[in-house]
Swiss-Prot record:
Highest taxon listed in the record's lineage: Eukaryota
Gene designation per UniProt: AIM36
Organism: Candida glabrata (strain ATCC 2001 / BCRC 20586 / JCM 3761 / NBRC 0622 / NRRL Y-65 / CBS 138)
Family: Belongs to the AIM36 family.
Subcellular location, record wording: Mitochondrion membrane
Keywords assigned: Membrane, Mitochondrion, Transit peptide, Transmembrane, Transmembrane helix
Any one cellular-component term (Gene Ontology): mitochondrial membrane
Name the UniProt record assigns to this protein: Altered inheritance of mitochondria protein 36, mitochondrial
Main location: mitochondrion
Targeting presequence: 1-33
TM region positions: 50-68
Membrane topology: Single-pass membrane protein
Coiled-coil annotated residue ranges, if any: none
């Protein structure tokens, strides 16, 4: 401030010959402002890039939807899909197509009125053989059920699918293409019927006593035109 009152000048080597007061005024006139950084044209996203990003997002969305659709259980089929499914079932059966003529019999011994001859398959005898054969893989389980339910009732207490499995093993060793087969007292349930026809062979006729016509298994075979009552 003393320099300003005396009117002294700043030496030239310091960059100006103006009085200090005037230098302050001149400097105040030249203020600096912060400016936003300039964007070169190349840094801005082009329309092509935006379109590519949009298409990529759409593709991801479609894949996600398709993935969810595949996880949903399929509960309806077109006619061609249903036929393909049936062909697949026939291919995995032990005796696919019409290799065997199989008659199921339930609650009657008069089946010979409808079918004569043929190989007789008795599930009870098959199960008993497995139960009484030492070292058989099913011996222990069958004997547990036998001891718990008795010699008669234990046949009806087998785990779901076991009777079909044992009948299938027997037929694999004792039946061949072109045979007529009569299975006694089988099937007793729609589950057994469905499993047998999928895994072993189709049933041509289901022969039953008149008194059993109103049971679920009889209604099942009646609906497909395979029920015969005697």
């Amino acid at each position: 401030m003393a320099l300003m009152r005396l009117g002294l000048r700043i030496p030239a080597r310091l960059g100006s010959n103006l009085p200090v007061a005037q230098l302050g005024i001149r400097a105040a006139k030249h203020r600096f402002y912060a400016t936003a950084p300039r964007n070169d044209g190349g840094e801005l996203p082009s329309i092509k890039k935006l379109l590519m990003i949009g298409l990529a997002g759409t593709a991801v969305f479609v894949l996600a939807v398709n993935s969810l659709d595949k996880q949903q259980p399929k509960n309806s089929y077109s006619e061609s899909e249903f036929e393909s499914l049936q062909r697949l079932k026939r291919k995995v059966a032990l005796f696919p197509g019409n290799q065997l003529k199989v008659y199921g019999v339930l609650g009657t011994e008069k089946y010979n009125k409808i079918v004569s001859g043929g190989k007789i398959v008795d599930p009870r005898k098959i199960i008993e053989k497995h139960r009484t054969t030492a070292g058989d893989r099913y011996e222990a389980l069958l004997n547990i059920l036998y001891d718990k339910y008795g010699a008669v009732e234990y046949f009806d207490m087998l785990p779901q699918g076991l009777m079909v499995k044992l009948v299938s093993l027997y037929m694999k060793d004792n039946c061949s293409e072109g045979d007529t087969v009569v299975i006694l007292d089988f099937p007793k349930s729609i589950k057994d019927a469905s499993q047998f026809e999928t895994e072993v062979a189709g049933i041509s006729k289901f022969i039953v006593s008149q008194k059993l016509k109103d049971t679920d298994i009889c209604k099942y075979y009646d609906a497909v035109g395979k029920l015969e009552s005697v």
